Amino acid sequence: WKTVRFGIEGAYPPFSWTEADGSLKGFDVDMANALCKEMQVKCKIVAQDWDGIIPSLLARKYDAIIAAMSITEERKKKVDFTGKYALIPNKFIAKKGAGLDFDNLDGQKIAVQRATTHDKYLTDNYGDKVEIVRYGSFDEAYLDLANGRVAAVLGDASALEEGVLNKAGGEAYEFVGPSLTDPKWFGEGFGIAVRKQDKDLTKKLDAAILSLREKGVYQEIAAKYFNYDVYGQ
């Protein structure tokens, strides 16, 4: 491997976002660059919408996905994963004083990003009770939360913090209900996805993640984006 191409969503801060000039920034982008440096390969970052992120890997548009993707049994049928590089709890966010009762969510509209672990969790646990509203990106979900079209959004705590709470007007919102980490739905943390035939690349990436943690580079990058230990237990 002389060059490794990483597929990144570019619409999921603090993991990735797109600047006005089209360049990608965020934790996943910094991690990709640091991993390439550690593996002594050239790095190429490819922006890819979430809906097509695994198909585009299989179609060789890039070699690995680093996009806050949870390691789940379902995804493992299609791709291989490195060990985790982050683990984040999942939470609901709503307007302050919305008074949502999590023992009785009947008829409430809850927003998720389509084809995510959050989507699957809601479908399996609340599918017959709530109206699940699915969006192509989190930004669209936030808009509908602000407009009162949905009662709550379910997502990664860090993405909700960055996308809503830390933004202008964020003080009008709060985390509500339980913190969700059940591996059955949310997997074993975020991993880097690689095509099954590229076992050598998965091994290289695993070794590089370990090395970045041992050298303290991982912690330096993480501290730019998170004020807690994003690696988890």
Give the residues covered by each predicted segment.
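Short, Asp-centered acidic motifs that coordinate Mg2+ and/or phosphate
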Residues: V4-R5, D63-A64, A151-A152, A159, ...
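Periplasmic-binding protein-like
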Residues: A86-A94, L165-D206, F226-Q233
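Acidic, polar ligand-binding/catalytic clefts
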Residues: N33, K37, K42-N104, E171-W185
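Ligand-binding clefts/hinges and TM-proximal coupling segments of bilobed small-molecule sensing domains
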Residues: K120-G136, E171-V176, D206-Q233
